[in-house]
């Protein structure tokens, strides 16, 4: 095992003594093998896993040099440090059989025989920070992110446009995954995946508004196309009076103009609703402003379309009944012209019904806003 000497004490001094627990021994006369024998006897008497024997000097400076030999898991030797009384603190340095330096059983610095230094942190060989997420560092040095567990929730709110929209969010939640063994390789670590999704689904009110806007657009377009294509040749008793067109009637021109305006407005509202449902972005950020603007324009264009449709319906009726006994459709053989005009007026009235339904939905949304605010 070797000889234990105190460099501060002269071995030739006959006054230096060593205490083995039973009496004083002259340090100058003690052989190293004798000290080893005393240590073994002390270990047997104490019943501990090592030997503790102090060496005292008579220099009068109240210093005690303590050395202990302890057989640990790797047969290590604990060498105490020179301390001054009355401090009770004592630091041990464990030297393993590999001639390295190891501090602590659960973590510290391990120095191998080759001289390299390794960090040992816990039984899992990594750093775990919190249960909800953190960083796990394996023995090879790679960083493993925690696994992700998907969660979802739904929310219904008043949208920025005509319809109610249900927004469904799908997000991710981080959870800590501890390796099964301390020797788990980096390839065994779970691959992190993050997914963020945002979906919007139409509610019943939203579906109705979507359908009404689409109907307004289609019906107005049909009324415009049919009325613009309305024309016929005026003939009676072999006499040709020329071609009869829709622009010869002021009511029909007014009907076409109003339907063009309604078509543009309904197309804009339809695109805004479609854009909001698919991308989640509205042209007007404020719900309050958007709802009141929609209600106002719906009312305006509803009155315009209703007046144009009724005016055109009056002219179409007079074409059959005649004015002052003159029936235009039957006398001048322009039946195709009158039929097309009737179809255009009918489509315009259907557009009025669709616009009226959108206005009722706008009133409902205003009532919801007033109740919330």
Swiss-Prot record:
Keywords: Cell membrane, Glycoprotein, Membrane, Transmembrane, Transmembrane helix
Bias kind Polar residues: ranges: 56-74
Extracellular face residues: 226-253, 298-342
One term under GO cellular component: plasma membrane
DNA-binding among keywords: no
Keyword Cell membrane found: yes
Topology feature Cytoplasmic, residues: 1-204, 275-276, 364-373
Bilayer topology: Multi-pass membrane protein
Region of interest called Disordered, as start-end residue ranges on this chain: 1-100, 172-195
Domain of life from the UniProt record: Eukaryota
Cellular localisation: Cell membrane
Subunit structure, as described in the record: Homodimer and heterodimers.
Protein name: CASP-like protein UU6
Origin organism lineage: Eukaryota, Viridiplantae, Streptophyta, Embryophyta, Bryophyta
